[in-house]
Amino acid sequence: RQRQMCIRDRLQTVPDIELLNIDKQQSELYPHLTQLADVLDGRKLKELLAGIDLVVLLAAEHKDNVTPTSLYYTVNVEGMCNTLQAMESNGVTRLVFTSSVAVYGLNKDNPSELHPADPFNDYGRSKWEAECLLQEWYDTHREWNINILRPTVIFGEGNRGNVYNLLRQIISGRFLMVGNGENRKSMAYVGNVASFITFLIENKKEGYNVFNYIDKPDFTMNDLVYHVGDVLNKHIPTTHYPYWLGMFG
């Protein structure tokens, strides 16, 4: 949801753009832009996309504790299918879809957009299935413009995800550094992701395009602890614990 807020903020600065926010929940900040609907409600989507020129598809089931796991596929794949059908019914031919680097799987060293998909969990597999659906769609809809964005872990205003929890642990002093701290964490700031989506809308108007998004450099855990302490002017303990001890929690 923080992505939606930042994208709306960014797009409202672009001349000659009128926004419609379609969401399952009413927006506290943008109620005047919001229409309530679910990507699983194809009929409602067809109704709301009348007169629309471009769709940014952010809707996704993404939390780690989703049950049943079939919800990943219901929302992420069937939701994509409903969106495409609603777009086609209304003559909408431009789509920006936020996928994920999760399609590459674990422990890949800076994979390019051409790297083979190797998702390791249901979230990643469902995102890849949604991309495959888009590829098949584009094969028979060559006049469309489809831009796929694969961001890494996103952090920023309004976010209470993994990066937020990590930084909160570091700030609290309860963070235990397991190993030598040289493992790296790739991240993307939500404001930068929103700006890149705006760039795609304004500049990538033809063809089928795929983009990874990561804000470089990747920080080591040692870097993160240092920078958090530096920003807060606070000493953060940096005792390192061996991996075998960390395995016991």
Label the predicted regions:
Residues 2-7:
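Short, small-residue-biased leader/transition segments that mark boundaries at the very start
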Residues 39-78, 82, 86, 104:
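NAD(P)H-binding glycine-rich loop region in Rossmannoid oxidoreductase-like domains
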Residues 73-80, 96-99, 126-127, 186:
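Short alpha-helix in the Rossmann-fold core of NAD(P)-dependent oxidoreductases
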Residues 82-123, 140:
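Conserved Rossmann-fold NAD(P)-dependent oxidoreductase catalytic core, especially the SDR/UDP-sugar
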Residues 104-105, 144-165:
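Flexible, glycine-rich beta-alpha linker
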Residues 120-147:
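Active-site Tyr-X1-5-Lys
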Residues 159-165, 179-202, 208-212:
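Substrate-positioning beta->alpha
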Residues 203-249:
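Mid/C-terminal beta-alpha module of Rossmann-like enzyme folds, strongest
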